[in-house]
Amino acid sequence: MARVKRGVVARARHKKILKQAKGYYGARSRVYRVAFQAVIKAGQYAYRDRRQRKRQFRQLWIARINAAARTNGISYSRFINGLKKASIEIDRKILADIAVFDKAVFAALVEKAKTALA
């Protein structure tokens, strides 16, 4: 039985990892052993941060809605409660967009929320 030489497979595997590590600083983009660890860690960060991105955007939307609501004389929590009581179903992403780009519409929503709370 012929001897199997694995140089071709190893070379391909190394090339694949080094290609993924392209653009990394120093040895992380040149040395296979270091690059492999860097690529694994990058994958872990990417996996974690895909989940964190959703939380961070929601936090950003809430901060923007709160700021706009307070300029109209109501807190965020009372504003959201008022919208629920007025049976206005707009998600936070759209509310934040309205708060930033269409202040008149946002002010009208605040008034509806205030009347629903009263």
Curated annotation (Swiss-Prot):
One of its GO terms (biological process) is ribosomal large subunit assembly. Keywords: Ribonucleoprotein, Ribosomal protein, RNA-binding, rRNA-binding. GO terms for molecular function: rRNA binding; structural constituent of ribosome. Disulfide bonds: none annotated. PROSITE patterns: RIBOSOMAL_L20. The keyword Secreted does not apply. GO terms for cellular component: ribonucleoprotein complex; ribosome. Binds directly to 23S ribosomal RNA and is necessary for the in vitro assembly process of the 50S ribosomal subunit. It is not involved in the protein synthesizing functions of that subunit. NCBIfam families: rplT_bact. Belongs to the bacterial ribosomal protein bL20 family. This is Large ribosomal subunit protein bL20. It comes from Erwinia tasmaniensis (strain DSM 17950 / CFBP 7177 / CIP 109463 / NCPPB 4357 / Et1/99). The gene is rplT.
